Amino acid sequence: MANSPQAKKRARQNEARFQINKARRSRIRTFLRRVEEAIASGDKEAATAALRAAQPELMRGVTKGVFHKNTAARKMSRLAARVKVLG
């Protein structure tokens, strides 16, 4: 348990940041899931639109420190390759 005022404040800040990051991560995962669903349905136009919507969200997650930039780049690259293959 935090004893000093500073430690108590850090605990409060950590919890607040955790909740914010949790919401951001959930939002990004939702966008990525929409791309996955569009790919699974085989609809190239919907998949492309979903990918275009997901990319800025994922990059925003990088800017905010939720994801590492290489992780985001890898996810976008793999999704883009799968969308490109759709006929």
Swiss-Prot record:
Entry GO terms, CC: small ribosomal subunit
Top-rank lineage group of the source organism: Bacteria
InterPro entries from the UniProt entry: Ribosomal_bS20 (IPR002583), Ribosomal_bS20_sf (IPR036510)
Membrane-crossing residue ranges in chain numbering: none
GO biological process: translation
Presence of the UniProt keyword RNA-binding in the record: yes
Keyword Glycoprotein among record annotations: no
Molecular function terms, GO-annotated: small ribosomal subunit rRNA binding; structural constituent of ribosome
UniProt keyword annotations, A-Z: Ribonucleoprotein, Ribosomal protein, RNA-binding, rRNA-binding
Gene3D superfamilies registered for this protein in UniProt: Ribosomal protein S20
NCBIfam families linked: S20
HAMAP family: Ribosomal_bS20
Family: Belongs to the bacterial ribosomal protein bS20 family.
Record's function text: Binds directly to 16S ribosomal RNA.
The protein, known as: Small ribosomal subunit protein bS20
Gene name of this polypeptide: rpsT
